[in-house]
């Protein structure tokens, strides 16, 4: 949603530190990428990130022989902060108690921020800029035809590029494919028991579930596997909050809300976030 016109009754809210931290934590909890990737403090002007592309090599030497010199391969990437925002309308009853407003923010906004961040990293949404890495063009492996073989192929490809598969993000659709996978005796391959219904690990790699990991296409992307030690995200500061009581909200498709006329107000949440990764050590998991 977007604000239309120039609001005349807009106020900035300084959230208490504990509330701001809780909102940010909720966003992180709703994002599989934020759970698996490393987090760094990101200055507003951006930061240079050193990515190790190869390790130094040790060699055997004689007792008095000169010791070999080997340098690691390094690549420098610039991580920039891009703004992610959402507006949510509320009824005026929320104004009666500030705590109710905070509760509403905590319950509704972080999930929207986290899911959009995931979907952007996974290529379902266009990157906000050239210094934001995505997995839109990574190597694909079919996990629908032969699920186990597909994961083994992904693990091998990641290893070929110098990574170790240590994290897998599945969409709900991808989880369905895994739950349907059975061995020759019709026993489930990827869950410990039917009662659990969850996929805790695959080939020793931790798994997370995210709606943002599904990208419709030909084929459809059901999830991603990779070496998450080679992925970094950063945030400039906590979630910024503004509200307006007399703006007009354009909901799209000709739908408009007049906040003053309908006894409502709208809250806008923003976060500045960046993402960088060695995309060669990530694979997309697709259907046939």
Tell where the protein language model's regions lie, with residue ranges.
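Short helix/loop capping segments that flank catalytic or ligand/cofactor-binding pockets
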Residues: 57-61, 97-99, 177-180, 233, ...
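Short beta-strands and strand-coil junctions in structured, solvent-facing domains, enriched
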Residues: 36-39, 96, 274-276
